[in-house]
Amino acid sequence: MSHIPSELKYATSHEWIRVEANGEAVVGITEHAQELLGDMVFVDLPEVGKQVGAGDDCAVAESVKAASDIYSPVSGEILAVNEELEGSPELVNSDPYGAGWLFRIKLDDAGELANLLDAEGYQNVVDEE
């Protein structure tokens, strides 16, 4: 069974988001998602400064099995991307909730977080697959 940290929020499309005290947030894909995809070979990240809407596809994870779109769980401006993934995409596999983060985003509307799932809700989504 996949690890689902309780302090994060989740999208049904298997992204996680961690909101920080300064109103910025970090986004990545869940352990469950990386298990389904398999070994990462490349991650195409969004451009810094790009505006994205909640649910917009903004990145692509390419693994030995498939390429999968990654969606922004919230609306906002991309502030930074994890440049470590350029040379080490496998960090998404080995540490999906830590060193394998994908991008930082400045939230346009913190109210959108209410549309996301807590750990229990996300576990139910995983169980239904």
Swiss-Prot record:
- Which GO terms of the cellular component aspect does the record hold? cytosol; glycine cleavage complex
Q: Which domain of life is it from?
A: Bacteria
Q: Name one GO biological process term.
A: glycine decarboxylation via glycine cleavage system
Q: One Pfam match, by short name?
A: GCV_H
Q: Which residues cross the membrane?
A: none
**Sorted UniProt keywords:** Lipoyl
Q: What is this protein called?
A: Glycine cleavage system H protein
Name the species this protein comes from. Aeromonas hydrophila subsp. hydrophila (strain ATCC 7966 / DSM 30187 / BCRC 13018 / CCUG 14551 / JCM 1027 / KCTC 2358 / NCIMB 9240 / NCTC 8049)
Q: Which gene encodes it?
A: gcvH
